[in-house]
């Protein structure tokens, strides 16, 4: 499952319960989350992903920063030194053996603020690598996203291991790009990939039913969107892989409908989630 949670925007106190309900109902083994609300005061860090993991009985790894100061006062009016971050996270039903993050390039190839997090999960079928990311969002930043997917491909190559025998890498994220964009075509092999013998299978394209739109005009938060009705959120799995391990069997959307929270109908996020089942043998 992959889902952009829309940070702390909108009616967040209601949305956070709606988000929890959707994830609990879907009951996924792995969840890739973007725009996770993170707060740091001194050495204490609290994140919405950790909150979800506790509520759902899952393990969690959350990206670290970048942190931005936010003026916040205690009861006596003193600045508490609060910082906030918009993070990426991986939640897992099974123990996380190892984890890390990389910073993706920004404009002019400088280090940006977008990150990719990765976790190697101790599943019943062996150590399985997962990656979660969130790319730049502006319409005019396709070239930046191409550099970002190249950095992502470097990471995936290093995580993959032996493509003939090891478990494939599964990637989830908000790529802020439609399927025929240069950046997605580069990942899926429709143009020359970053690395020979490494392309990503688009799970929705292979087994999803319908358009798979995740940025939707029927979402109440999209009333003023410049370009609604796009498929921006993806689950990918690496190819080649030891078939049928990692083949996607079916894919569907979640979090599209509103939830009743405290007597009010609220949509969980401005994005729909993408959920899929994969073959494991």
Specify the residue positions occupied by each region the protein language model found:
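Active-site beta-strand/loop signature of hydrolases that rely on acidic residues for catalysis
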Residues: 1-5, 19-45, 91, 119, ...
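Short catalytic/ligand-binding loop motif for oxyanion handling, primarily in non-cytosolic enzymes
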Residues: 9-10, 39-42, 69-72, 87, ...
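N-terminal membrane-anchoring alpha-helices
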Residues: 10-24, 266
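Structured beta-strand-rich core segments of catalytic domains in phosphoester-bond hydrolases
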Residues: 12, 36-131, 135, 253
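A conditional alpha-helix N-cap/helix-loop micro-motif detector
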Residues: 12-16, 109, 145, 149
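Extracellular/periplasmic catalytic domains that process cell-envelope and extracellular macromolecules
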Residues: 25, 54, 82-84, 110-112, ...
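Metal-dependent phosphoester-hydrolase catalytic domains
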Residues: 157-170, 177-281
């Amino acid at each position: 499952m992959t889902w952009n949670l829309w940070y702390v925007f909108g009616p967040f106190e209601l949305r956070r319960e709606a988000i929890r309900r959707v994830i609990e109902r879907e009951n996924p083994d792995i969840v890739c989350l973007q725009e996770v609300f993170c707060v740091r005061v001194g050495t204490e860090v609290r994140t919405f992903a950790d909150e979800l993991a506790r509520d759902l009985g899952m393990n969690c790894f959350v990206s670290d920063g970048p942190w931005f100061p936010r003026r916040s006062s205690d009861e006596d009016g003193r600045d508490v030194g609060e910082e906030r971050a918009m993070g990426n996270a991986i939640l897992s039903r099974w123990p996380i053996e190892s984890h890390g993050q990389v910073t993706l390039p920004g404009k002019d190839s400088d280090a940006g603020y977008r990150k990719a997090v990765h976790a190697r999960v101790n599943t019943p079928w062996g150590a399985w690598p997962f990656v979660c990311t969130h790319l730049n969002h502006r319409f005019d930043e396709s070239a930046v996203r191409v550099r970002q997917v190249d950095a992502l491909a470097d990471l995936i190559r290093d995580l993959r291991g032996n493509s003939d025998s090891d478990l494939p890498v599964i990637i989830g994220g908000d790529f802020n790009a439609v399927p025929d964009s240069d950046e997605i075509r580069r990942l899926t092999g429709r143009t020359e990939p970053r690395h020979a013998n490494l392309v990503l299978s688009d799970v929705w394209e292979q087994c999803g039913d319908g358009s798979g739109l995740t940025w939707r005009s029927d979402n109440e938060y999209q009333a003023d969107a410049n370009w609604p009705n796009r498929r921006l959120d993806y689950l990918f799995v690496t190819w080649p892989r030891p078939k049928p391990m990692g083949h996607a069997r079916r894919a569907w959307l979640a979090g599209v409908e509103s939830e009743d929270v405290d007597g009010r109908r609220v949509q969980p996020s401005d994005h729909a989630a993408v959920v899929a089942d994969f073959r494991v043998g």
